[in-house]
């Protein structure tokens, strides 16, 4: 529906679709959504990116720059593959002081501002895909991506 709405916007030069893959295969889901977008024959390019497993996993990849703010304690540590953890929102909540919970509407923007792209790039393939998709849109290299 959003792509149909964007089609009516005369100044739309491209759309980045960014969603959580959750338990789905990020690559397959992105290809499926891109195929659906291609059928719409949109007058602008569309890039689809699926964060594996959740957008918030990128916060774990840059935890060193986030801890000490956003209700995350200075000593918070995550060990493991950030692209394999399910329930990142719950993990973030468990790090917070008692009575606090992670809320996308409250924490997501600030945590995103604190991300270190270099750290996240090294630890997350789906983030590298995001960067590539943005570059494709900027360069006007695509109609729909991935193919």
Where are these regions (language model features)?
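C-terminal accessory helical subdomains adjacent to catalytic cores in phosphodiester-
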Residues: 2-147
């Amino acid at each position: 529906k959003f792509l149909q709405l964007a089609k009516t916007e005369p100044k739309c030069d491209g759309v980045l679709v960014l969603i959580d893959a959750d338990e789905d295969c990020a690559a397959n889901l992105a290809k499926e959504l891109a195929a659906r977008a291609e059928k719409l024959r949109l007058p602008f390019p569309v890039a689809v990116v699926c964060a594996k497993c959740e957008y918030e996993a990128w916060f774990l990849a840059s935890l060193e720059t986030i801890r000490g703010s956003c209700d995350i304690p200075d000593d918070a540590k995550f060990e493991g593959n950030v692209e394999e953890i399910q329930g990142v929102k719950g993990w973030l909540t468990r790090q917070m002081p008692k009575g606090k919970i992670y809320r996308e509407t409250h924490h997501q923007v600030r945590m995103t501002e604190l991300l270190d792209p270099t750290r996240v790039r090294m630890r997350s393939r789906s983030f590298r895909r995001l960067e590539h998709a943005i570059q494709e849109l900027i360069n006007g290299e695509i109609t729909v991506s991935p193919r």
